[in-house]
Each structure stands twice: as C-alpha cells, then as structure tokens.
Amino acid sequence: MEEIEIKFAVKDTKIITEKLGKLGFGVTVGRHLEKNYLLDDHDGNLQKAGTVLRIRKTPSGRTLTYKGPISAASKLKHREEIECRIEDADILLPMFEQSGFKIRTEYSKHRTVFEKNGFEISLDETEAGNYLEVEGPSDADITKLGEKLGYSETDFVRRTYAELIGEKRSG
C-alpha cells in the first residue's frame, strides 16, 4: 500500500489541537506512548537503500512494518508501506538479531491520532520537537489541509523521525 504523508513542526500543541477540532477532526486514539525499533543488517544496507524495517510497541498492540524508499518525484513523502500485527515483539526482536539484524535506532514518542474523511493526523511529541504527521488521499488534499492549519509548502518536513532524533542526539 502506498503511504502519502508529510510532517509539520508544531510550536503549540494546544493551538493545533483546537484548529483540528474546529475542522471537525476527532481524536480516535488518545495520547499514548509508542516505542519504535528500527532494524538493519550489520552493514546498514536497509538505511543505505532508504528502506525501513520497524517494530513498534503501543498500548494497543505491536506491529512489524516495512517502508520502501521515499519517492523523489513529490514534495510530500510517497513510499510503499507493508504492515502486520505481531503478537510478541519481545520474542521477534531476538529472532531478527539471530538472523543478522540489529537495532539501528530506538526512539519513543507520545502520539495522539485524529481522523476525518480519509485523513489520519498524528500529533507526535518527540525528543526532537513536536510534529503533526498528516497522511491523506493525495498531495493536493494534504497540501490544502496544511494550508487550513496555517502551514505552507515551505513548512514541509520530509525527514523521518529517526533522522530528526538522530540529529538532535548528535547535536
């Protein structure tokens, strides 16, 4: 499945939450902690190829996700995403490690999810700052929604959380 998304930096989470409410977005998943583990082989070939293999733990479950490389053909992030629920991440992580993979990056964030009309918006609080991650049906729809929230194309953040947090940690 193709994922189409973009991030925007958020200065004030209360203001952006109010704007989303005024636009009719409702909270579908309340604020919760997510733990993310990005896996790679020992040579870093997944990162070099621009792909991601991630295990995510949330209070409602665990998922294994593959993300393909980000397309350069758009200002927004287009990439293949394949995801499945897993029962026991604590068993799966050592299985990957025994198969030649290692945890390349580990990070946590608090996330609140809002939805409406084919959009999924995540308000993410990370150690690198707060971001609004907008997934939607098309570039035009996402850009239009961004404008309603007070953002423009110059505010697009195409970097991944792993990149943003890595920069903050090395910084």
Residue ranges: model-predicted function:
Residues 1-119, 151-171:
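N-terminal strand-loop-strand beta-hairpin
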Residues 12-16, 130, 141:
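Short phosphate-engaging motifs
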Residues 70-73, 129, 140-141:
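Short, surface-exposed beta-strand-loop junctions and turns on beta-sheet-rich folds
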Residues 123-125:
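A contiguous pocket-lining binding segment that forms or flanks enzyme active sites
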Residues 145-149:
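Internal alpha/beta scaffold segment
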